[in-house]
A protein has these predicted regions:
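Viral virion structural and adsorption modules
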Residues: 158-180
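Disulfide-rich extracellular domains of secreted proteins
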Residues: 1-157
Length: 180
C-alpha cells in the first residue's frame, strides 16, 4: 500500500530574521514573518513518518507564502541531513499579496548517497530557507504553510485479528468469519 504524508516543522534548529515559525504547520492564515534581508535564514526539523515504510518513493518541499507586495523575494530551500549537510537545493519565490502555493522538485533519491531515501533519511530530514535577493522592495515575506510531502510504501496487512473500536468496515469481496 502507498501512503502520502505531509511532514511539518517540529522544532527550530536555528533562526535569524524569522519569527512565529510555529505558525507554518497548517494552511490557516496564521503566518510566520520572514525578514527579506541579507543573513535571514531558518533551519528546522520535521515530524516523523507515522508508519514504517518498506520504501520511500519521493520527497518534495511545498509552501504557501506571500511577499505582501507585487514584488518577489527569492529564497533557497534546502533539504539537509541531521548534520546540516545539504541533500539538495532549489530556489523559489515568495511573491504576490496573497498566499501562493508552490511545489518544488520531486526528489526520488538522496543526492548525498545517490540511492533511494531511507526511513532514517526522512525521519532526520531538516529544511533550510535562506534569503537570496528580491525584485523591487520586499520588506517582510509571510509564510503560511511549509511542509515536505513524502510518498512511501508500507507492507500490506497480513492475516490476523482486526480490532475495530468504532467505525465501519467495507468489504468489496471475500468472506468474513465470526468466532466467539
Amino acid at each position: 500500500a502507498q501512503v502520502t504524508e505531509d511532514l511539518v516543522q517540529s522544532s527550530v534548529v536555528s533562526s535569524t530574521g524569522v519569527t512565529d515559525f510555529g505558525n507554518t504547520v497548517a494552511s490557516d492564515d496564521n503566518r510566520a514573518s520572514f525578514d527579506c534581508s541579507s543573513g535571514t535564514n531558518i533551519i528546522f526539523e520535521l515530524t516523523n513518518l507515522s508508519q514504517t515504510p518498506t520504501s520511500i518513493v519521493s520527497a518534495q518541499i511545498r509552501h504557501e507564502a506571500q511577499a505582501q507586495t507585487i514584488q518577489s523575494a527569492v529564497v533557497s530551500m534546502e533539504m539537509l541531513n541531521s548534520s546540516n549537510t545539504q541533500i539538495n537545493t532549489q530556489n523559489t519565490t515568495f511573491s504576490t499579496t496573497s498566499d501562493f502555493s508552490q511545489n518544488l522538485t520531486v526528489h526520488t533519491t538522496n543526492d548525498l548517497t545517490s540511492a533511494a531515501f531511507t526511513a532514517d533519511d526522512i525521519n532526520t530530514l531538516r529544511v533550510k530557507i535562506t534569503y537570496i535577493t528580491e525584485t523591487g522592495t520586499v520588506t517582510t515575506a509571510l509564510i503560511d504553510h511549509i511542509f515536505v510531502r513524502v510518498i512511501y510504501n508500507i507492507a500490506d496487512p497480513v492475516a490476523g485479528l482486526i480490532k475495530l473500536t468504532s467505525g465501519k468496515i467495507k468489504l468489496n469481496s471475500g468472506l468474513i468469519g465470526i468466532k466467539n
